[in-house]
């Protein structure tokens, strides 16, 4: 007859298996109460800014240490922004207004090419930035910014340059919202909003990053797709040829009609409305949409772009696209939008479980 006694090894294995089983059940129970939310879109559309806003509105926000830690990024963004203008100036075969500015340009370009973290500006750097920014030729280059890739918050930082140059400078929340740090890989944050836990994923939008998205597509409750509508006359950074909004529309069509998201709520943020409205003063959207015959009226142009996105929905009989026109740096407006999105997602979940 076989022995009914357990060996010490088998008892230990049973204990380990029991611990693993309990953890799996706990993870499954935790997942039931969570809402999985993806932030998707092309590079520099504002995904990370939206996540920062959610953190400000519904989590711990940013501590003084958090703000101090991004000071170097602010300095770097300014230097890189001015360097981008100088390189574009050369591309357009422009010459700086005075020979004295050439030394300033070389100083800024050498800092931009350095692999070191940006430090507080020494007087030489601060004065060079100010002189170059106010040079008519640099401003002439800036007016042609749709023809090359540059950070769209540079004007904000240049307007705040004297404050940023202060010896005891600590970035503000507004500074934090406007810094540019490309998202590499996946940033995940769990935040409780209105009694419901949301597991939010922000993934890099550059082409090279999108292959990392697929493992996140399972069991998604809602997708927020963000498109920067001011980019209708700008080229993609990755190849310098593809129109940025055309790329965004193409990506939205793929995401919206993916089998992974047929049951998920599809939310569309037409972002950077402030920059879009400003651009309409000098440029028509028919530079991209040749069939558009309307005026440069802001509301009319937004409605047309919204239609171009929403008509791509192949499941319109069973799936609605919830569209919001946003400015990601406007905390008050984003609070209203996020509250609306959260109410909608929670309501859908309650209806899906028969609890409403």
Swiss-Prot record:
A lipid is attached at residue 2 (N-myristoyl glycine). It comes from the Eukaryota. GTP binds at residues 41-48, 177-183, 202-206, 271-274, 328. The keyword Protein transport does not apply. Mg(2+) binds at residues 48, 183. Residues 198-207 are annotated as: G3 motif. Residues 33-356 form the G-alpha domain. Transmembrane segments: none annotated. GO terms for biological process: adenylate cyclase-modulating G protein-coupled receptor signaling pathway. Belongs to the G-alpha family. Guanine nucleotide-binding proteins (G proteins) are involved as modulators or transducers in various transmembrane signaling systems. This is Guanine nucleotide-binding protein alpha-15 subunit. It comes from Caenorhabditis elegans. The lineage of its organism: Eukaryota, Metazoa, Ecdysozoa, Nematoda, Chromadorea.
């Amino acid at each position: 007859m076989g022995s009914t006694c357990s060996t010490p090894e088998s008892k230990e294995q049973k204990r380990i298996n029991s611990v693993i089983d309990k953890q799996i059940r706990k993870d499954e129970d935790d997942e039931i109460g969570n809402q999985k939310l993806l932030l998707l879109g092309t590079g520099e559309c504002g995904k990370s800014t939206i996540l920062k806003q959610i953190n400000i509105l519904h989590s711990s926000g940013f501590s003084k240490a958090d703000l101090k830690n991004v000071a170097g990024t602010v300095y770097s963004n300014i230097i890189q922004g001015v360097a981008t203008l100088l390189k574009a100036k050369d591309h357009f075969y422009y010459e700086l207004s005075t020979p004295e500015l050439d030394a300033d340009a070389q100083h800024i370009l050498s800092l931009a090419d350095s692999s070191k973290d940006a430090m507080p500006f020494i007087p030489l750097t601060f004065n060079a930035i100010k002189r170059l920014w106010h040079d008519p030729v640099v401003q002439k280059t800036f007016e042609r910014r749709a023809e090359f890739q540059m950070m769209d918050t540079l004007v904000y930082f240049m307007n705040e340059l004297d404050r940023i140059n202060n010896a005891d400078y600590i970035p503000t929340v507004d500074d934090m919202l406007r810094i540019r740090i490309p998202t590499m890989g996946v940033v995940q944050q769990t935040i409780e909003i209105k009694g419901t836990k949301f597991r939010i994923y922000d993934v890099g939008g550059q082409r090279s990053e999108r292959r990392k998205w697929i493992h996140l597509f399972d069991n998604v409750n809602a997708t927020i797709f963000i498109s920067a509508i001011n980019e209708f006359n700008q080229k993609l950074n990755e190849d310098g040829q593809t129109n940025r909004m055309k790329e965004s529309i193409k990506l939205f069509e793929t995401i919206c009609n993916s089998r992974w998201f047929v049951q998920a709520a599809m939310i569309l943020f037409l972002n950077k409305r402030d920059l879009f409205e400003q651009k309409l003063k000098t440029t028509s959207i028919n530079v991209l949409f040749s069939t558009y015959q309307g005026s440069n009226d802001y509301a009319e142009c937004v409605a047309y772009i919204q239609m171009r996105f929403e008509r791509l929905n192949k499941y319109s009989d069973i799936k609605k696209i919830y569209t919001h026109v946003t400015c990601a740096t406007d905390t008050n407006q984003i609070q209203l939008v996020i509250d609306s999105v959260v109410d909608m997602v929670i309501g859908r979940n309650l209806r899906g479980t028969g609890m409403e």
